[in-house]
């Protein structure tokens, strides 16, 4: 008997955070997808302006991407936990899954701050 969408959602709602993380990992493996792809940045508001010189506009939102953890993996995991608020296991999974998005849609100042903290810990970071 197939479970309905509502039954599945109710089952997920009753799971602990760790069970949900394990479920997501199992779904990623089974279907060959990543959860990070589902969290794509939304398009910027007010985007259909048609002003000329649009390519010359200064970028206001940045995605912070962890490219590599370098030689200090433990330090980078601590830094990722500090800037994201993730738990130890989740931060470790992010660091081991390089390249991985750390923060999407961040302001220039916030993105530079996160980049500095991660690079101080030994990571390679890109701003997009």
Curated annotation (Swiss-Prot):
It comes from the Bacteria. It holds the Pfam family Ribosomal_L12_N. GO terms for molecular function: mRNA binding; structural constituent of ribosome. Keywords: Ribonucleoprotein, Ribosomal protein. The keyword Ribosomal protein applies. GO terms for biological process: translation. Homodimer. Part of the ribosomal stalk of the 50S ribosomal subunit. Forms a multimeric L10(L12)X complex, where L10 forms an elongated spine to which 2 to 4 L12 dimers bind in a sequential fashion. Binds GTP-bound translation factors. Belongs to the bacterial ribosomal protein bL12 family. This is Large ribosomal subunit protein bL12.
């Amino acid at each position: 008997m197939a479970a309905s969408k509502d039954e599945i959602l109710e089952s997920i709602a009753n799971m602990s955070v760790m069970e949900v993380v394990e479920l997501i990992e199992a779904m990623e493996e089974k279907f060959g997808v990543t959860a990070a792809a589902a969290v794509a940045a939304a398009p910027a508001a007010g985007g259909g302006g048609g002003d000329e010189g649009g390519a010359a506009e200064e970028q206001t939102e940045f995605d912070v991407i962890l490219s590599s953890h370098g030689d200090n993996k433990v330090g980078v995991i601590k830094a990722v936990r500090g800037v994201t608020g993730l738990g130890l296991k989740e931060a470790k999974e992010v660091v081991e899954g390089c390249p991985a998005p750390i923060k999407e849609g961040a302001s220039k100042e916030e993105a530079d701050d996160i980049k500095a903290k991660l690079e101080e810990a030994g990571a390679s970071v890109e701003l997009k």
